[in-house]
């Protein structure tokens, strides 16, 4: 995992843990927390330079396949490997119709919070400050907006286009909630 992806894993992990504690404390078990940690660590693996060019598939789908193979090869329980892979595949599959696993729901909430500033009421300002102090954003919004545009340029059919070919990268780049901390190093 690159430094850039590590930053994202840490910020999504930190804000996701806060959302879990505030909104869904009954979900937290040792197994759930470990599976969520793996999901945070690996959810953007499909966006690395190597992986984004390795396939015609959208980064979420290719990333899910990579994650499934890696976790199985490392001896993870199949249920955990499949749960993480499904969450990686669906972490940007936003909508208000249908169902999703708890891990999938939490990674969606945390990534849309971190990338777009959505659902700002789920995480206290002090918690955001603690997370970005421990894990500086290092201009994450501009970086990820560029990654979305790069994938959409390479793959005009990419799954992220369902969030708006221009609306999504512009929303990430213009994330007002995280703007005060986006330049932290």
Regions found by a protein language model. Give the residues of each.
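Short leucine-rich amphipathic alpha-helices used at interfaces
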Residues: 51, 58-59, 102, 108
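Active-site flanking loop/helix segments enriched in acidic
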Residues: 1-9, 46-51
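An active-site-proximal "capping" alpha-helix that borders the catalytic cofactor pocket
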Residues: 12-13, 58-74
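Divalent metal-dependent phosphate-bond-processing catalytic cores, especially two-metal-ion Mg2+/Mn2+ enzymes
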Residues: 3, 10, 14-30, 76, ...
């Amino acid at each position: 995992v690159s430094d850039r992806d590590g930053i994202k894993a840490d910020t999504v992990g930190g804000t996701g843990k806060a959302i879990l504690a505030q909104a869904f404390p009954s979900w937290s078990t040792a197994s759930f927390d470990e599976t969520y940690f793996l999901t945070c660590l690996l959810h953007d693996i499909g966006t690395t330079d190597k992986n984004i060019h390795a396939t015609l598939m959208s980064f979420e789908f290719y990333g899910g396949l990579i994650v499934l193979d890696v976790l199985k090869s490392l001896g993870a329980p199949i249920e955990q490997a499949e749960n993480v892979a499904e969450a990686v595949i669906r972490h940007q599959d936003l909508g208000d119709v249908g169902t999703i696993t708890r891990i999938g729901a939490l990674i969606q909430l945390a990534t849309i919070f971190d990338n777009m500033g959505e659902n700002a009421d789920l995480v206290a300002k002090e918690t955001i400050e603690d997370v970005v102090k421990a894990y500086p954003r290092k201009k994450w919004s501009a970086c990820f907006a560029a990654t979305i545009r790069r994938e959409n340029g390479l793959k005009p059919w990419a799954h992220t286009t369902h969030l708006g070919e221009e609306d999504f990268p512009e929303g990430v780049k213009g994330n007002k909630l995280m703007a005060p901390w986006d330049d932290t190093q």
